[in-house]
From Swiss-Prot:
Principal location class: other
Signal peptide: 1-19
Protein name, per record: Tripeptidyl-peptidase 1
Enzyme class: hydrolase
Entry EC number(s): 3.4.14.9
GO-annotated biological processes: bone resorption; central nervous system development; nervous system development; peptide catabolic process; proteolysis
GO cellular component terms, semicolon-separated: Golgi apparatus; lysosome; melanosome; membrane raft; recycling endosome
Amino acid sequence: MGLQACLLGLFALILSGKCSYSPEPDQRRTLPPGWVSLGRADPEEELSLTFALRQQNLERLSELVQAVSDPNSPQYGKYLTLENVADLVRPSPLTLHMVQKWLLAAGAQKCHSVITQDFLTCWLSIRQAELLLPGAEFHHYVGGPTETHVVRSPRPYQLPQALAPHVDFVGGLHRFPPTSSLRQRPEPQVTGTVGLHLGVTPSVIRKRYNLTSQDVGSGTSNNSQACAQFLEQYFHDSDLAQFMRLFGGNFAHQASVTRVVGQQGRGRAGIEASLDVQYLMSAGANISTWVYSSPGRHEGQEPFLQWLMLLSNESALPHVHTVSYGDEEDSLSSAYIQRVNTELMKAAARGLTLLFASGDSGAGCWSVSGRHQFRPTFPASSPYVTTVGGTSFQEPFLITNEIVDYISGGGFSNVFPRPSYQEEAVAKFLSSSPHLPPSGYFNASGRAYPDVAALSDGYWVVSNRVPIPWVSGTSASTPVFGGLLSLINEHRILSGRPPLGFLNPRLYQQHGAGLFDVTHGCHASCLDEEVEGQGFCSGPGWDPVTGWGTPNFPALLKTLLNP
């Protein structure tokens, strides 16, 4: 049947299931650990679905990202505005017409878009949604650390073939909330009586990374930073104030968040949210801080998509964003990964520095056709973000050199090819590492991560008015590195320079300048006879465990201040 026939009587064909296709045939629909089905949803219950509309001129967008992010380019630092991006990638008039006509025929109501017009979120009843998306069958689920309730479909959905050139995917059907890169470890035993610290605090971080009491924001520049929270994770201002009273006495700081974008609940504070806010604001001290709160409170919402749409709907944004969440690449559809990667590319074009935690499963492990392979995570594997790994002190209670934190995520993407900016560094690692795992375990030609690292082991956090020790994970290292980049942006802005923007092209050109090289330790992987639980190992220069290393702030400031 030809396209013209599919266009005729479009809604009737939806109902009959003819001329249809699956946008996400590879989307995993198995139930994640810790989630339980509560049965079919009421047909009259409402949910929201997000339709990702096909964008234009993505090759040109990629070229512009390279131009504004490469210090050797005459376009370096000349970032696009949101309006520039919208004009470039906005869906075609035909796409907008086709999708809106289809939704109107299905009875979708209360639809709203974003400035770029490439996401459309609509409210429908379960009955309408199942008619609109043949094959979908909505169920209630509960799970996650906060017993979150969601509505998802365990079955694949179909779209009319006529929409294939116009819709990338529909959000709110399959993907469960992303997982956090956060762990709480048992308190280590102190041997002997001399210890310089009993856990990582802002003063420990500032001493290790060579910050002085003067390394704080001015409080007057047009500089800001942000972190994103999901899974109904909330912070409390009272916890932040107590944290600063306990640990912020030797540097100027702000004791409250400047702005919350989204919904900030009034329930118990989450350790994840508390950690992110407290260490972003103590590392990036005295800098205006936003919190993006995308709880996914309504059962049909995907919180990560909510966050991306918030970025696409505001012209003036913080310069640095840190995110401590992710999923295994293989758990997500190709359509979803590619579209999210495009959204991250759009952020890079606008001069945003996006930092993602590398994860807390080492190289990861899963079985493919009966054989173990390492398991990369996304968005850590995106070529348009700076990914942060984790380290530990070589001597647990001394502020010493750092070694690999064995849970620090890292590896090679199975989706994205190696970007040109890291070609030299990764090729050198692959040719010189004495402890390389067998080639069948990883995709040596993929985007390699992390790019940098910071301490990730043994943090103190205040949550619900209680100081909590030994919180660990790349959820800790990511806001720390982000805060230090915000301090560098402060110097750049005050001297009339643009903010750093997408950091990786510059980072790899500078070959680790301004960073402490971490050369000892390996991270975890598959527990089998061939690799015996060992993934990749660190070494001189870049490696897929700690990237280029951890920040030496005065040297990193000098390296990144010019041009």
